[in-house]
């Protein structure tokens, strides 16, 4: 059904040929699409702050948690052990973790689309992934494509930030496994390189698509 939906969506939009960009969860979908369905007409793929393995992702998040204060580490460990993700100490620790590695509070100078209030799909996030970035216990807990990455034949641009949830190890895993790939690491960027270094990000995409068009 998923393959039929993707083919029909592309047909409806007239996307016979395209450059496929997947950011975060979108990158996971892109990897699944290329590995399992082997579609035609994909000129290149941009895998932006994404991952090929829920297990690897969780491992790297827990590694970064070790750089937090002992108080925050204990609060997170307690929440994972008890399953109580409503404790104020945990919520504060998780907020600090996300501030370090996901994104900051929008500034007054940021575009309106970033500043306006958002409706966050908490239920769908928990169902698909879990209560946070480092506890994948949802439907995607068994997402594992590391051994299939070698089957991606399209040119692949891998992007992540030095402070990203998508750590350099996660990005390097994709780079090492995808035959025709290029890796660009953004200094001092978190999970939203396109926000925190917009000019470089857009220049890179334009250059990449021109080279692979």
PLM features: residue spans?
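Short, small-residue-biased leader/transition segments that mark boundaries at the very start
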Residues: 1-5
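Active-site acidic short loop of glycosyltransferases
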Residues: 11-17, 39, 153-154, 180
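Conserved hydrolase catalytic core segment
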Residues: 16-60
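Short aromatic-enriched loop/helix-cap "lid" or pocket-rim segments at secondary-structure transitions
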Residues: 56-61, 171, 196-198
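Alpha/beta-hydrolase
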Residues: 66-154
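Conserved loop-alpha-helix segment in the C-terminal half of the alpha/beta-hydrolase fold
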Residues: 146-189
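Catalytic active-site module of serine/aspartate enzymes centered on a nucleophile-bearing elbow/loop
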Residues: 181-213
């Amino acid at each position: 059904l998923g393959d039929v939906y993707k083919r029909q969506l592309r047909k409806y939009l007239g996307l016979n040929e395209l450059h496929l960009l997947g950011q975060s969860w979108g990158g996971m979908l892109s990897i699944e699409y290329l590995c399992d369905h082997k579609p035609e007409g994909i000129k290149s793929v941009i895998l932006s702050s994404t991952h090929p393995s829920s297990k690897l992702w969780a491992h790297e998040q827990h590694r970064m948690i070790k750089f937090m204060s002992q108080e925050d580490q204990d609060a997170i460990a307690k929440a994972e052990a008890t399953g109580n993700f409503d404790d104020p100490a945990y919520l504060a620790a998780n907020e600090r973790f996300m501030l370090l590695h996901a994104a900051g509070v929008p500034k007054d100078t940021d575009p309106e689309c970033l500043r306006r209030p958002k409706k966050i799909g908490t239920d769908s996030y928990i169902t698909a992934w879990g209560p946070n970035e480092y506890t994948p216990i949802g439907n995607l807990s068994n997402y594992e494509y590391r051994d299939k990455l070698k089957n991606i034949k399209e040119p692949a641009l891998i992007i992540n930030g030095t402070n990203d949830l998508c750590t350099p190890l996660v990005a390097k895993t994709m780079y090492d496994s995808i035959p025709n790939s290029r890796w660009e690491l953004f200094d001092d960027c978190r999970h939203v390189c396109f926000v925190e270094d917009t000019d470089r990000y857009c220049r890179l995409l334009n250059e990449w698509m021109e080279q692979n068009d």
